[in-house]
Amino acid sequence: MKAKEIRDLTTSEIEEQIKSSKEELFNLRFQLATGQLEETARIRTVRKTIARLKTVAREREIEQGKANQ
């Protein structure tokens, strides 16, 4: 998911995406440990997506803080 797509989501949708991505990452790591994971690059892409989601969420937090001052 690209940053532009993430910025179009609402804050609650971003939180849901973070939650589902973390679950997916957990499952991918479990598959890696058991030797069932074929597409190992998927772990990296999910981690990057989580980072992008968290970055946009933090940007919104900072914007709200500035608006309240």
Curated annotation (Swiss-Prot):
Q: Which GO terms describe its biological process?
A: translation
GO molecular function, a single term: structural constituent of ribosome
GO CC, sorted alphabetically, is:
cytosolic large ribosomal subunit
Q: Which InterPro entries match?
A: Ribosomal_protein_uL29, Ribosomal_uL29, Ribosomal_uL29_sf
The protein's matches in CDD domains, at most eight in alphabetical order, are given as: Ribosomal_L29_HIP
Enumerate the Pfam families for this protein. Ribosomal_L29
Q: Which UniProt keywords apply?
A: Ribonucleoprotein, Ribosomal protein
Q: Which family does it belong to?
A: Belongs to the universal ribosomal protein uL29 family.
* HAMAP family membership: Ribosomal_uL29 (MF_00374)
Q: What is this protein called?
A: Large ribosomal subunit protein uL29
The UniProt gene name for this protein comes to rpmC
